[in-house]
Amino acid sequence: MDTQFYDVFVTEGENPTFAYRTGLTTYTEGLRDGIFTALGWNGAGYMALAQDGCDPTILNPADYIAPQAFELELDGQSLMSHWAYEGCERIEGKDNLTFKITLRHTVRPVTVKVCTLLDGACVFSRWLEITNRAQSPAALGRLAVLSGGLETTLRWKNHVKDQSADSPYRL
């Protein structure tokens, strides 16, 4: 039997955090001080949040110029911060899971649903549903549906086996 594994683990409260797992790929993001930020990636299927019940902030948002999990600009105004968490929705499909996080901007009348589709593959699909709640139209200037910092491994050579061995790959 070939089963595909996917799930989302949610921690609500002051710092809502969302940990996705599809196959062995995990991705964590959450709202920190009004910024919806990328918090970490893992290719081994391990979700610290689900395992330990702690805040697994692998990536420190303060270490990155743009830690946001998505980028949005309307009418020349960057909407990178000032987000408030409104809730989330889990939509179970036959062979997949769509998870939607609703964020409301506290300065502009804009709502964003961050939508993630998991199907057990090692990659996931991401899109944004943007609602302009103002009476007038808004010009979309910039959009990135998935962004944020990438992890680095200190002392990475300690994790690599003999580089002199025959292999088509080198670090």
What are these regions (language model features)?
Residues 2-171:
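Polysaccharide-binding surfaces and accessory modules of carbohydrate-active proteins
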